[in-house]
Amino acid sequence: MIAYCGTTKMSDDIDWLHSRRGVCKVDLYSPEGQQDQDRKVICFVDVSTLNVEDDSKGAAGPRSDGELNLENLEEKEIIVIKDTEKQDQPKTEGSVCLFKQAPSDPISVLNWLLNDLQKYALGFQHALSPSASSCKHKVGDLEGDYHKIPSENCYSVYADQVNLDYLNKGPQNLRLEMAASKNTNNNQSPSNPATKSPSNQRSVATPDGECSMDDLSYYVNRLSSLVIQMARKEIKDKLEGGNKCLHHSMYTSGEKGKTSPRSAVSKIASEMAHEAVELTSSEMRGNGEEGRDGRKTFLYSELSNKNKCGEKQQMCPKDSKEFADSISKGLMVYANQVASDMMVSVMKTLKVHSCGKPIPACVVLKRVLLKHTKEIVSDLIDSCMKNLHNITGVLMTDSDFVSAVKRNLFNHGKQNAADIMEAMLKRLVSALLGEKKETKSQSLAYATLKAGTHDPKCKNQSLEFSAMKAEMKGKDKGKTKGDPCCKSLTSAERVSEHILKESLTMWNNQKQGTQGRVPNKVCPSKDEKREKISPSTDSLAKDLIVSALMLIQYHLTQQAKGKDPCEEECPGSSMGYMSQSAQYEKSGGGQSSKSLSMKHFESRGAPGPSTCAKENQLESQKMDMSNMVLSLIQKLLSESPFSCDELSESENKRCCDSRSKQAAPVAKRPEDQSQDSTEMDFISGMKQMNRQFIDQLVESVMKLCLIMAKYSNNGAALAELEEQAALASNGPRCGREAVMSQSYLETPGPEVIVNNQCSTSNLQKQLQAVLQWIAASQFNVPMLYFMGDDDGQLEKLPEVSAKAAEKGYSVGDLLQEVMKFAKERQLDEAVGNMARKQLLDWLLANL
């Protein structure tokens, strides 16, 4: 007799995160002294860990629509098999819950945990309910395959009749008897069975003498079908080491050697099954692999290897480094490519330089440097954003936040990139040409870009840096005027000049090819500026950094195309610079924002009396993060002796126009030319956007990400709570199940014994036990026992439950702690921290 339980949505009625029900006690199961107590036994089986091959289609025709294939069991389906006959132990009732465990979801941890928690809750619900209440209607026996009802966003529960007894001779002595009856749907009786797929329990049944001959024939035939399919699998696999199938055979003590009478129909099949079991038992005893009295675990591919390969035994373990190797393979290939190109270019440079021709080799070196610098910067930015997305989840789906963080990270990384490029150029020059640096005095000009500040309290420091920069520029101009004949350049200067010339030419060509509307006056301006190069290594290194910044800014603009509002307003321009410049020329400079006025101050500047008013307006308007970061990049470009006035001007106008359209509070008003000529002090401070401010900005963003990732407060899960609320409102409640679950939430239930038949990892085993503990607590179970903890992974669970009860934790509090652990573990995996705690250790330390 089969009891079918209809579609169930019980768990949607429970607000798990806010449940105030107290946690129950937990202990490990011991069979002594618990015979007279009323208790329930639940066996949870994850069908995804069972390797089931269905070969019955070729022998018995295609599978009918009414049959359920356990291989295709959906994640929303649960099969519950209940024990309705309690002859030997009337106070013990057993149930088996078949389900498929949901894969981990790093984006939505709450949905992932609730998916498994709801399945365990449904198992407890139907196990704790009376046997009669689970019957909705009756269908015929399908020999282990159950009638399937399509389900979408709900859980389908199927129940069958079974006798499940736990004996007291050992902790793992399990006898599982399947009830057989006539099949009324397929017109097929157990006395003439077709070849069916094996029971997904992988259990060798030992029926009592009360069973009829037809029942024995039915059981033996199913067992023979299992043996035949295992033999086919062993022949097919050929010991390839993949898809290992772990089977659990469960016996009762004292009945292993007994042979049951067989019918004539299944005599040959039963002999094959008996020989296979005896062969397995004898080989495992000979190798010292015998388990406890009533349970044996063996690997079928290993047995086949022993039979066919003699004494040689191959375990075929899965390589634990396969995943790490696959990840590092791509990185190593890319690193080798970069290293090879660099080595070849250096060798060519040395070879050509020995012949006295450094220029062609420098062109090769320049191309390699520019190519790989651009690729590395692009890959770093992309990888940073991907890692941030994995850590913060919902936070990084905000386009405004992503844009601000991306620009902020780029500006922060620019500081180190500038030092690296400068050091690289100097080391290459010294290694190739053996020249020493003549002076280091002008390196102070770079310090002004890093150590300055626009804080009014540090205004004196900004003025000192501004004066230092003006002095350095005056010295450079004096040197240039003092040598009008343009003396011959050294080899180091030729190296730098060619690198700069080619890089700027390439950048200009790319811009012309994509935009098509570049004014012709840009290139002559570059040539005029190029003639005024200061013949020092520091100045050339600075210009190289400027060209790198231009390329990086071009790359960022191309990547953000279509996402930035300013890009949408100017679709015809790939960079969005020249169109804004043309608009500004037509308007005559009548409107401006902070960036535009800054450029005007820079070109005309002298100190004036309206500085305090400007500073107050700056503080009140609170310029957004991305505007400040981009303004710093544009100031760097404008400081270069190679940058074009028109280009820098158009860059600042583009930023100013787009920001003024995007930010409503920014005021637009005409600028008085007399006031523009009196603002050099204020702008000298604005030019000194110090590195300390950027460092604090990046640190604040990263702290925000860490706080949200670690869920430091209980209200941080609001985004996922909305998803849970949406799931809870997707469909109507099932009235009968809601009433039944409500009745069992109010009254204390019997003690429950849980046995998990899942070959999962240690973390999954502990997480599964904790979620089952939470589900049992919600159903008012007074005492929960776990059996089958042979490896000792759950030995700390009683201590955790005692501590949680002492601290007054509820079901919702415990689930939130599990969520915090899952978030911290994902964060550790993202940063490469391998020293991770197990779940029970973490709970002991943090409860």
UniProtKB/Swiss-Prot annotation:
Map out region (PKA-RI subunit binding domain) in residue numbers.
334-343
Residues cleaved off as propeptide: 1-187
Q: Locations of Polar residues compositional bias?
A: 182-204
Record region (Disordered):
182-209, 511-536, 583-613, 655-677
Question: Which segments show compositional bias classed as Basic and acidic residues?
Answer: 524-533
Q: Which residues carry this modification: Phosphotyrosine?
A: Y300
Does the entry feature the keyword Phosphoprotein, yes or no? yes
Keywords annotated in UniProt? Cell projection, Cilium, Cilium biogenesis/degradation, Flagellum, Phosphoprotein
Q: Region (Interaction with Prkar1a and Prkar2a): which ranges? A: 218-231
Its Gene Ontology molecular function terms?
protein kinase A binding
Similarity section: Belongs to the AKAP110 family.
**What note about domains is in the entry?**
RI-alpha binding site, predicted to form an amphipathic helix that is required for binding to Prkar1a.
Q: What is this protein called?
A: A-kinase anchor protein 4
Source species, please? Rattus norvegicus (Rat)
